[in-house]
Design a protein with these regions (language model features):
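Short alpha-helical Gxxx[C/S/T] motif in the catalytic ATP-binding
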Residues: 174, 179, 183
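Helix-loop junction within the histidine kinase core
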Residues: 48-59
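Short alpha-helical segment of the dimerization/phosphotransfer core of two-component systems
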Residues: 32-37
């Protein structure tokens, strides 16, 4: 894409020794914004695919526990930067299910990104599996203690470009409002669901 063609030369310029500190800082900001735009473009394309009639995912047996651990590790540094307690709870035995690994990873990534972005002090993710031997039935639950999303917004936030935005103590969060819509569509393509819980003490997605 054109954004990818912009990102490459930017990275090359940043690596040059003769670039002064002020210019390098500006270039890094440009690179970060380019990456955000690239990520948004990819998410929009993915969302359009999931909404296309006849679109299907290919499923294969996947180590769900492994995906959760890997994704948790990817967000650990960002959570630490924000001073968050960032925990993962999984059964002792690895759990396998037939999923589309790439799509499943996107769902978890979006939920954790959302949690880390809005949380005040903690983000918790857990894997719940049935006692019966059912390799396609499980639940992922994420919780964060950000500003509580009101009941009237708990369905609205799953619509494209709808984002709950509340200023508190002068803090403003930014986002595109596409991640949750994409995650729900991908969950539904797995014959699953994605919704917000009714709890008032935290924001729960499962």
């Amino acid at each position: 894409t054109p954004l990818t063609l912009i990102k490459g030369p930017l990275e090359n310029i940043i690596l040059k020794k003769q670039v002064d500190a002020e210019t390098r800082e500006d270039l890094n900001v440009m690179k970060q914004n380019t990456e955000r735009l690239l990520n948004l473009t990819n998410q929009l394309l993915d969302f359009r695919k999931t909404e296309s009639q006849g679109f299907r995912l290919n499923f294969a047996k996947c180590n769900v526990t492994e995906v959760l651990k890997e994704t948790h590790v990817r967000f650990t540094s960002l959570a630490k930067q924000k001073g968050l307690e960032f925990t993962l709870q999984v059964p002792e035995k690895d759990f396998y299910a037939h999923v589309n690994r790439e799509a499943f990873t996107k769902i978890i990534s979006n939920l954790l990104n959302n949690g880390v972005k809005y949380a005040e002090s903690y983000v918790h993710i857990s894997l719940e599996v049935p006692e019966a031997d059912d390799n396609n039935s499980f639940r992922i639950r994420t919780e964060n203690d950000g500003v509580i999303i009101p009941n009237e917004m708990k369905e609205e936030i799953f619509k494209p470009f709808v984002r709950f935005n509340e200023k508190e103590d002068g803090k403003v969060t930014t986002g595109t409002g596409i991640g949750l819509a994409l995650s729900r569509s991908l969950a539904e393509l797995h014959q699953g669901t994605l919704a917000m819980g009714a709890g008032e003490e935290n924001n729960t997605f499962c």
